[in-house]
């Protein structure tokens, strides 16, 4: 039977490490990390997610600065706020909650964030640093995937990894992180020809395709590790609806280990946001940035 990789427990351990790191930073005479969270509009899912982020931020000893703007806020006004936050020495991390209203170009907003404060890891500078293997701020979900894998894999060198999904948020960066660990990586997507045959070659499968139950039991070889990033709600809202991943969990008992949905990758994203905020604060204050990328 596949071992269940408990993302909730691992995320809790990371949050505890971050809290200890904040205490150590202030004991060294540094300022506690500060995270600015910017929310434009009243999207219900975004409101819930931002509330969760802020609560966990405060529990870790990180100061939070919340900026809620009306849905009609202009792009220029939002860019002006980002510029002020870039100059604010009390703010070490800036997070703009996505999605933004349609009249605001998300790429312009994300590109305006100081790369040193880009705790989501989406700025082109941080993407470039990741691609060449130098220290930057790593996107939170891919970083969380790697930390989960590290709990069940001691040596990544030479392992065959198949990533299903090519997004800039998960697929591409997690592929680069796996390459950094000397895996042999194949990036695929839902239109890839002979996808099941490709997945069957993998020691590690990371699926982030947004397709419920895409990876079937006969796609995965015995002993492989499956990281399921998918979060899909199926069924009628308020009745029999439930969250499922992109892998057919009940068919994958022959895997060595697998993340559940919910309770796998999801909790790691916010935990890694806190981790990135601590790293950003230490770097901006001239302290050792430990923990480093991929550690």
UniProtKB/Swiss-Prot annotation:
Keywords on record: Amino-acid biosynthesis, Histidine biosynthesis, Hydrolase, Methionine biosynthesis, Multifunctional enzyme, NADP, One-carbon metabolism, Oxidoreductase, Purine biosynthesis
Domain of life: Bacteria
Keyword Oxidoreductase carried by entry: yes
EC number: 1.5.1.5, 3.5.4.9
Catalysed conversion reaction: (6R)-5,10-methylene-5,6,7,8-tetrahydrofolate + NADP(+) = (6R)-5,10-methenyltetrahydrofolate + NADPH; (6R)-5,10-methenyltetrahydrofolate + H2O = (6R)-10-formyltetrahydrofolate + H(+)
Recorded GO MF terms: methenyltetrahydrofolate cyclohydrolase activity; methylenetetrahydrofolate dehydrogenase (NADP+) activity
Gene Ontology annotations of biological process type: L-histidine biosynthetic process; methionine biosynthetic process; purine nucleotide biosynthetic process; tetrahydrofolate interconversion
CDD domains from the UniProt entry: NAD_bind_m-THF_DH_Cyclohyd (cd01080)
Pfam families, alphabetized: THF_DHG_CYH, THF_DHG_CYH_C
One GO cellular component term: cytosol
Disulfide bond sites: none
Gene3D superfamilies, sorted: Leucine Dehydrogenase, chain A, domain 1, NAD(P)-binding Rossmann-like Domain
Associated pathway: One-carbon metabolism; tetrahydrofolate interconversion
UniProt entry tagged with the keyword Oxidoreductase: yes
Cross-referenced NCBIfam families: PRK10792.1, PRK14188.1
HAMAP family tied to this protein: THF_DHG_CYH
Function of the protein: Catalyzes the oxidation of 5,10-methylenetetrahydrofolate to 5,10-methenyltetrahydrofolate and then the hydrolysis of 5,10-methenyltetrahydrofolate to 10-formyltetrahydrofolate.
Subunit relationships: Homodimer.
Family per similarity comment: Belongs to the tetrahydrofolate dehydrogenase/cyclohydrolase family.
Protein's UniProt name: Bifunctional protein FolD 1
Species classification: Bacteria, Pseudomonadati, Pseudomonadota, Alphaproteobacteria, Sphingomonadales
């Amino acid at each position: 039977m596949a071992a269940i990789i408990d993302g909730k427990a691992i995320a809790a351990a990371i949050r505890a490490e971050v809290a200890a790191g904040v205490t150590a930073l202030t004991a060294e005479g540094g300022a506690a990390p500060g995270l600015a969270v910017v929310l434009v509009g009243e999207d219900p899912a975004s409101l819930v997610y931002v509330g969760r982020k802020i609560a966990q931020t405060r529990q870790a000893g990180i100061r939070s600065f919340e900026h809620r703007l009306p849905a009609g806020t202009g792009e220029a006004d939002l860019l002006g706020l980002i510029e002020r936050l870039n100059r604010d020495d009390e703010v070490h991390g800036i997070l703009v909650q996505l999605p933004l209203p349609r009249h605001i170009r998300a790429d312009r907003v994300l590109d305006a964030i100081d790369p040193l404060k880009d705790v989501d890891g989406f700025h082109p500078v941080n993407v470039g640093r990741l691609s060449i293997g130098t220290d930057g701020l790593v996107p939170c979900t891919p970083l969380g995937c790697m930390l989960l894998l590290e709990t069940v894999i001691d040596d990544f060198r030479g392992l065959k990894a198949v990533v299903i999904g090519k997004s800039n948020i998960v697929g591409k960066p997690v592929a680069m992180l796996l390459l950094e660990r000397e895996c042999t990586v194949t990036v695929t997507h839902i239109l890839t020809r002979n996808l099941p045959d490709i997945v069957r070659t993998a020691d590690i499968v990371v699926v982030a395709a947004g397709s419920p139950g895409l990876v079937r039991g006969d796609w995965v070889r015995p002993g492989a590790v499956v990281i399921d990033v998918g979060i899909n709600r199926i069924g009628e809202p308020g009745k029999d609806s439930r969250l499922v991943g992109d892998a057919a969990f009940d068919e994958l008992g022959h895997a060595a280990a697998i993340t559940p949905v919910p309770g796998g990758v999801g909790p790691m994203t916010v935990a890694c946001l806190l981790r990135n905020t601590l790293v950003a604060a230490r770097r901006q204050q001239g302290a050792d940035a430990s923990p480093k990328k991929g550690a």
